[in-house]
């Protein structure tokens, strides 16, 4: 009886603290710093990766977009593996340290690739694949576990703070992204006074990314035992065997229960779905025909396996289904948002006037505005959610996410309108890309940290890291879709100029009013210029206006449908907001 009374007194004390103290645990700032350096590493590398592949490794833009999308997709597929290993064996802390070291090593191998391509391009390509593979698995160990630990910092009486906590955490993500997108292009994407790119400079950008990841890993290692702890002082994120009953909700099962039949059906489903997606994504590029089907098939399979757990209660099942539904819509957001690293970078490189404040900004650095805006607006957004919650007027998480999807549709509609009359030689003013990134930042702050918070609120603890992995898989599917959609970009001004230098009327070739000779086709192929317009669901993409309208329609429709589903999702969340 005394134990029950003491437990009740502790719970009441925590509730009173939650009402009167808005501050967050110091451990949040440790995770903030660790994630900041990891995002420096990731986004810094991302800013120069496709440019390195195209300019140094002599890959086609379409192929580099597919590789980029596949790489990002796998980076958000492996968190399922990292989440599973963490929940069952290693714990959050060990997985974060392992993942950080792996990513630092991967970036160092990219440094090696960018150092040897001039004398041995095949070795450089091999090192590229090795590096990306190591980074993919390192990210898988790191990403779901640090997000899961943010959620674990708050006892159940303080879960209402998670939207604000993840928005602050997201500010760290984007501070790191800003620094990475500033420093890595400055040292790695260098042009001389004549505008000629130094294709041997990319290595310094990759080296900077590796050093940043080592700093982030060291920060976590040194500070984790002092600050990443429960309110009672117990370390968070240790080995799963060290969990105690207080770590779980009342009546919550502490272990998942999968029947042999469920596991067998999961294997069969994965194989069947792989071949279905392989058929739907027919082509010659192995990224598109092997990696993308694996991402989609494994995501659906694991989602089905989790809800087959016999220990799930009705409330837990409904909440997990909300995570799945929201994840589906977030896929369309990332498919549009992640054009930043592929098609938007190519447009910034080839068809944008980047002259700003008397300086020609490198194309890989244009993405930096997103990081600047997130860092500037994340804290005001967190204050906004706090004030609305205090007045009991805070929108439901799914409404915030529908607003985010709607905003990204608006951003692409504006850019589509401004490229409509560019023609083959006009330049887009950089102010329009800056406006696009501003609106997309508002969209991101309404959607991404809120999604992370929602997973933290709705996940049963025994599935916490794994469900973050599943949630990140929606990002993976979005990134894979981003790669496929990014490859739809039609010929930009530089392609028409190069074709003209070769004596070829590219516009006439694309319009099919002139039949190119075999020699002309060979010249176009050699110079990485397509002789036909890209196709999307049976429609030909003739220009940048049509290209950007694809994203307007995808995200606009997704926003409307998610908003209409909100009453049903509210009911399924069973009191969670």
Residue positions per predicted region:
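C-terminal ends and interior cores of transmembrane alpha-helices
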Residues: 98-123, 401-425
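Short amphipathic helix-loop junctions that connect adjacent transmembrane helices
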Residues: 47-67, 189, 288, 340-366
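Hydrophobic core of transmembrane alpha-helices in multi-pass small-molecule transporters
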Residues: 36, 106, 119-145, 327, ...
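Intracellular loop-helix junctions on the cytosolic face of multi-pass helical membrane proteins
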Residues: 1-26, 156-157, 188-345, 350-355, ...
């Amino acid at each position: 009886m005394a134990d029950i009374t003491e437990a009740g007194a502790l719970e009441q004390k925590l509730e009173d603290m939650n009402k009167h103290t808005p501050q967050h645990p110091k451990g949040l700032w440790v995770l903030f710093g660790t994630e900041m350096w990891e995002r420096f590493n990731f986004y810094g590398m991302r800013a120069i990766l496709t440019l390195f592949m195209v300019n140094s490794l002599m890959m086609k833009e379409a192929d580099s977009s597919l590789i980029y999308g596949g790489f990002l997709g796998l980076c958000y597929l492996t968190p399922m593996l990292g989440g599973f290993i963490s929940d069952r064996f290693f714990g959050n802390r060990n997985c974060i340290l392992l993942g950080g070291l792996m990513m630092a090593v991967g970036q160092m191998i990219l440094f090696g690739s960018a150092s040897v391509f001039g004398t041995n391009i095949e070795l450089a390509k091999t090192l590229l694949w090795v590096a990306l593979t190591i980074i993919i698995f390192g990210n898988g160990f790191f990403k779901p576990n640090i997000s899961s630990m943010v959620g674990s910092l708050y006892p159940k009486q303080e879960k209402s703070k998670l939207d604000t906590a993840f928005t602050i955490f997201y500010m760290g993500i984007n501070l790191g992204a800003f620094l990475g997108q500033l420093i890595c292009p400055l040292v790695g994407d260098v042009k001389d006074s004549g505008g000629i790119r130094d294709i041997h400079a990319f290595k310094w950008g990759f080296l900077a990314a590796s050093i940043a990841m080592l700093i982030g890993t060291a920060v976590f290692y040194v500070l984790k035992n002092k600050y990443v702890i429960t309110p009672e002082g117990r370390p968070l994120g240790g080995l799963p065997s060290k969990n105690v009953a207080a770590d779980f909700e009342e009546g919550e099962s502490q272990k998942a229960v999968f029947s042999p039949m469920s596991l067998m059906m999961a294997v069969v489903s994965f194989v069947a779905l792989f071949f279905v997606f392989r058929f739907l994504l027919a082509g010659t590029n192995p990224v598109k025909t092997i990696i993308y089907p694996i991402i989609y098939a494994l995501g659906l399979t694991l989602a089905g396996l989790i809800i087959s757990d016999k220990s799930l209660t009705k409330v837990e099942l409904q909440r997990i289904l909300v995570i799945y539904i929201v994840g589906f819509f977030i896929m369309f957001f990332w498919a549009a948002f992640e054009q930043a690293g592929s098609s938007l970078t190519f447009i910034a490189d080839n068809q944008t006037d980047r002259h700003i404040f008397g300086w020609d900004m490198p194309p890989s650095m244009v993405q930096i505005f997103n990081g600047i805006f997130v860092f500037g607006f994340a804290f005001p957004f967190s204050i906004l959610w706090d004030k609305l919650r205090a007045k009991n007027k805070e929108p439901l998480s799914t409404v915030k996410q529908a607003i985010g999807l709607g905003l990204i549709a608006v951003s692409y509609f504006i850019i589509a309108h401004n490229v409509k009359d560019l023609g083959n030689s006009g330049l887009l003013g950089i102010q329009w890309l800056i406006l696009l990134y501003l609106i997309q930042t508002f969209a991101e702050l309404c959607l991404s940290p809120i999604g992370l918070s929602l997973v933290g609120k709705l996940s049963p603890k025994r599935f916490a890291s794994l469900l973050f992995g599943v949630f990140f898989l929606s990002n993976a599917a979005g990134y894979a879709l981003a790669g496929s959609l990014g490859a739809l970009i039609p010929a930009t001004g530089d392609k028409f100029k190069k074709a003209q230098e070769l004596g070829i009327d590219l516009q006439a070739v694309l319009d099919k009013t002139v039949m190119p000779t075999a020699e002309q086709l060979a010249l176009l192929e050699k110079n990485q210029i397509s002789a036909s317009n890209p196709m999307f669901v049976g429609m030909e993409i003739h220009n940048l206006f049509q290209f950007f309208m694809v994203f307007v329609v995808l995200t606009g429709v997704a926003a409307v449908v998610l908003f209409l589903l909100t009453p049903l999702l509210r009911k399924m969340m069973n009191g969670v907001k």
